[in-house]
Amino acid sequence: MTKQIITLVGRPNVGKSTLFNRLSIRKKAIVHDLPGVTRDRKYTDGKIGSFEFLLIDTPGLDEHPNSMGERLIEQTTKAILEADLICFMVDGRSGILPDDKLLSSFVRKYNKPAILVVNKCEKAFDFDKEYYKLGFDSMIAISAEHGTGLIDLYDEIIAKLPEEESIKTNIADPIKGDCLQIVVSGRPNAGKSTFINALINDERLLTGPEAGITRESIEIDWQYKNNHIKLIDTAGLRKKSTITKSLEKLSASDTINSIKFANTVILMIDALAPLKQQDLNIASHVVNEGRSIVIVVNKWDLVKESEKEAFQEEFYYQINTHLPQVKGIPVLFISAINKQNIEQVLDACLKIYKIWNKKITTSKLNEWLNFTTEAHLLPLQKGGRRVRVKYMTQTKTRPPTFKLFSNNPEKITDSYTRYLVNNMREAFDMPGVPIRFIYVKTKNPYV
């Protein structure tokens, strides 16, 4: 039996994301006092008491001046249809507003079990008749921020969804295990959410022409060719100098944190926007974090056929020039909106993930090391003795990391290290992943 689903619904800024984080087994949502922070429905494993469930956070619904309002309603409707129980949230400080009344009617028409959750009740709270007029038979007052009232909420949830029907499973660790975590990153409006929607064949994420629609990292569990994949859509990363609002700073921090714990990062680039320093900065950050990377140029269908060859030539030149430390990064040209070449992206991710996890035997490493250092000798030290790398071994994967033992590691130049790394990349077929060398001084300086 699968876990039962609880969906949080309400107008903006009533505290849905705060309660989402409070009930989640790990923090997921950005919390900010600006209305409308959440724009997609988000899923997490939740727990209250001994009762485990799947929890959905939804966008705050209000009157939007453009087409985004319809898209937000669509996201919320899908979450309501999935739900076994709805927690309809209102703000106990501001009281019942016209939007609350409209939304309660919208929710009740689906005839789902529901609880009215009055949030931000740090002090004793009395329900007046306005709350009863919303039409819910179960009401509870809580403070999601301070954690008060959660025992009462637990009792109400159990009354609606008996505890014995839940499955008390252990939640998989988000980083370890066989789940491949793929983070989709890039500048705003590159088509990251459109790409994920095309992959999973569902309008799971809010998309549109407005830059910056995605404001926080959204995780989606998915299966591809018998591989368990977690797709993570992130907020677009702007230059630091252009990030002025505190919400954007939170979104950028959330994106950077997602990259830190990714297995593979897809760097999405808009074919209609020239490759900029910010794209290269993001790629460098991914590499510095030791993640594997796949570069995807989206909106390829909008580039004129006569210009594509020159575009690719210049693009590869820029990548190879500015990211020489990771030669062979996979680059794919796609159209997310037309679903052109999108599966090739996942195939590239699976391939580079295997390289990122590659383990090389010590015997093969040292056979390669002897041949490579003899072909290009290290410099002489004072006194005529040559700098040598005597021995090496692989200490870890993800990324491949090697320890090299030398009689004088301080004399090994960066250019010689690049020579070794590039030679290793070719010899062991390791394109596009960071390779790290750690030099250790041997106890005997004469070896």
Swiss-Prot record:
Residues annotated to bind GTP 1: 10-17, 57-61, 119-122
Domain EngA-type G: 4-165, 180-357
SUPFAM superfamilies: P-loop containing nucleoside triphosphate hydrolases
Family per similarity comment: Belongs to the TRAFAC class TrmE-Era-EngA-EngB-Septin-like GTPase superfamily. EngA (Der) GTPase family.
Protein's GO biological process: ribosome biogenesis
Superkingdom assignment: Bacteria
Function: GTPase that plays an essential role in the late steps of ribosome biogenesis.
Domain KH-like: 358-443
GO MF terms, alphabetically ordered: GTP binding
PANTHER family: GTPASE DER (PTHR43834:SF6)
Alphabetized CDD domains for the sequence: EngA1 (cd01894), EngA2 (cd01895)
Protein name: GTPase Der
Subunit structure: Associates with the 50S ribosomal subunit.
Cited InterPro entries: G_ENGA (IPR031166), GTP-bd (IPR006073), GTPase_Der (IPR016484), KH_dom-like (IPR032859), KH_dom-like_a/b (IPR015946), P-loop_NTPase (IPR027417), Small_GTP-bd (IPR005225)
